[in-house]
Amino acid sequence: MFRLLVLMGFTFFFYHLHASGNLTKYINMKYAYLSFIAIFLLAILTAVQAYLFIKSPEKSGHHHDHDCGCGHDHEHDHEQNKPFYQRYLIYVVFLFPLVSGIFFPIATLDSSIVKTKGFSFKAMESGDHYSQTQYLRPDASLYYAQDSYDKQMKQLFNKYSSKKEISLTDDDFLKGMETIYNYPGEFLGRTIEFHGFAYKGNAINKNQLFVLRFGIIHCIADSGVYGMLVEFPKDMDIKDDEWIHIKGTLASEYYQPFKSTLPVVKVTDWNTIKKPDDPYVYRGF
């Protein structure tokens, strides 16, 4: 009975993620077909387990009271004689993620995660892309052969370098950021606009902060926080996690806290916006 309930629960959970649109908070929707396969397989297993439960001797009323001396039902009896906690401990392992996934609210990543992990630009300084979470600069080279990656970046450079004004949307946020960080000198003086959540971090000046988005490559486990340093004409009182849309001119400057030269947006126009229903951005391949 417990097996049947657990399988029914997981089938419902995956279906609920699709129906509610919350699947995007866990994986890149490019891989949504995997969850459809999971739903299909779980539904089959649930049906099989339901059939076995209905046809079990306890449900059908056919009991074997005689002892043939051949060890019949010894394994079943041995299982029943185990202590309760031994028989059902394994189900707790499955029930915990199931209950938490269905009944607990889904927490989206925000600036508190950035603070906890430590916000730095070490990935760019060291060139070690494997050891830590990516910050500011997206790097998809990990997922391509070098020739293929270089070819894609050249195509993206041709796309964005032909624009006098670059408007980054949810669909191309990561690709646009990656292109600008890879060719910073080629975009100086260009107008750029995008939106994200504010994060002050180690900003030295009160008129500077970071505008960031959490980006997902495959799933939430490989997420990074990407965006740019922005500089306002005057001191601003913008709180962390406040969502803003900014527009300005691309420049570059040496940022002392990171000991690196960063692209920076000199803001000419900005406004606060409502937090999007889906706060994440995704990398297309």
Curated annotation (Swiss-Prot):
<dbReference type="Pfam" id="PF09323">
    <property type="entry name" value="DUF1980"/>
</dbReference>
<dbReference type="Pfam" id="PF21537">
    <property type="entry name" value="DUF1980_C"/>
</dbReference>
<dbReference type="GO" id="GO:0005886">
    <property type="term" value="C:plasma membrane"/>
</dbReference>
<keyword id="KW-0472">Membrane</keyword>
<keyword id="KW-0812">Transmembrane</keyword>
<feature type="transmembrane region" description="Helical">
    <location>
        <begin position="4"/>
        <end position="24"/>
    </location>
</feature>
<keyword id="KW-1003">Cell membrane</keyword>
<dbReference type="InterPro" id="IPR015402">
    <property type="entry name" value="DUF1980"/>
</dbReference>
<keyword id="KW-1133">Transmembrane helix</keyword>
<dbReference type="InterPro" id="IPR048447">
    <property type="entry name" value="DUF1980_C"/>
</dbReference>
<protein>
    <recommendedName>
        <fullName>UPF0703 protein YcgQ</fullName>
    </recommendedName>
</protein>
<feature type="transmembrane region" description="Helical">
    <location>
        <begin position="34"/>
        <end position="54"/>
    </location>
</feature>
<dbReference type="InterPro" id="IPR048493">
    <property type="entry name" value="DUF1980_N"/>
</dbReference>
<feature type="transmembrane region" description="Helical">
    <location>
        <begin position="210"/>
        <end position="230"/>
    </location>
</feature>
<dbReference type="InterPro" id="IPR052955">
    <property type="entry name" value="UPF0703_membrane_permease"/>
</dbReference>
<feature type="transmembrane region" description="Helical">
    <location>
        <begin position="89"/>
        <end position="109"/>
    </location>
</feature>
<comment type="similarity">
    <text>Belongs to the UPF0703 family.</text>
</comment>
